[in-house]
Each structure stands twice: as C-alpha cells, then as structure tokens.
Amino acid sequence: MVQISTDYVFDGSATTPYAADHPQAPCSAYGRTKAAGEWAVRLADPASMVVRTAWLYGDHGPSFVKTMLRLAKERETISVVDDQTGQPTWA
C-alpha cells in the first residue's frame, strides 16, 4: 500500500531538510488529516510506504513553475518569497 502525503505534516520551522522519521507537528487541518492518514496506513499495513511530496508541477494544471515563467514573460521584474527551500517535483 502506498500513501501519498505532504510536507504539511511538519510545522515548517526546520532550517534543514526533514528526515523521514522527523516528529510530525502539523499546523493545519490539512496537515493533521495527512498525518492521520499516514498513521492509519502504517497501522493497517506495516509494509506500506508513505511518499511525501510538495512543489508539484507538470504539463497539466497550474503550478508555481508555470506561474513564474508566465510572469517572467509579462513583467520586467518579479518578486517571490526567498525564505523557503524546496524540491520542485515533476508530476
């Protein structure tokens, strides 16, 4: 069994990448439901796998990458957050 989850199971305060076994501390209802889903899957099948992903982009649907490319064409200067680190994931 594979559970698709998210980095929202963490509180976002880490200054280095989260390890797979880092203690969960969700700050939102969404994060809490994802954490509960992870727990339920592991309880149901100890051989299960949890895949946490974020910053998805691809050919279909909106994404940060597509938005930045569009804005770069439309504007001379664009502003983005500079206090986040992530790994864009092709989906």
Outline where the language-model segments fall.
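Aromatic-residue hotspot detector
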Residues: 1, 10, 63-64
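Catalytic helix-loop patch of NAD(P)-dependent Rossmann-fold dehydrogenases
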Residues: 8-51, 55-56
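NAD(P)-dependent short-chain dehydrogenase/reductase
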Residues: 40-86, 90
